[in-house]
């Protein structure tokens, strides 16, 4: 039983040639070491170029995998401020595409925003990854998503542990409200 290789139409969007090369090399390594994965790779260094390339894809020729740098220069003509705007458009027009966000932003607020808006199948902070990690990350995104790099996971953990932290008093207030206690009666408790 010979399995036919699955070819992924892949778009790498980053304004740094070295990063594009790293992604390309990781994909070529995967294609060489697995028999069932192949990649047709296109590159874009700006929102405008990416937008132009994305127009080539349709239901018969799908865009399957996208590497998206968030810190892309703005595109006034498209009304895009960063790669995040481009990510929203990819989600809308190519819902089947697996998006791997790669960024240097590592603050919790930006990471949460990207999750909320794009919800990528892969999310890596560039300083977290080397060639080996990148290959492993891509395999996971393709075969068993999601993949999040260490800093992203730490931000998620921090968000979860901070967002729902209720002390005894908070729980008591919620209980009283659920029992029909009026807001104006709360100070008397």
List each language-model region with its residue ranges.
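Helix-turn-helix DNA-binding segment
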Residues: 155-189
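Acidic catalytic/metal-coordinating carboxylates
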Residues: 46, 76-85
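Short, flexible helix-to-coil linker/hinge segments that flank and couple to helix-turn-helix
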Residues: 112-116, 120-122, 128-164
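A short, hydrophobic beta-strand element within the central beta-sheet of small alpha/beta folds
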Residues: 66, 86-112, 125
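Active-site residues of response regulator receiver
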Residues: 64, 68-71, 75-76
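Conserved acidic segment of CheY-like receiver
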Residues: 7-28
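Conserved phosphotransfer cores of two-component systems
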Residues: 56-60, 89-96, 117-118
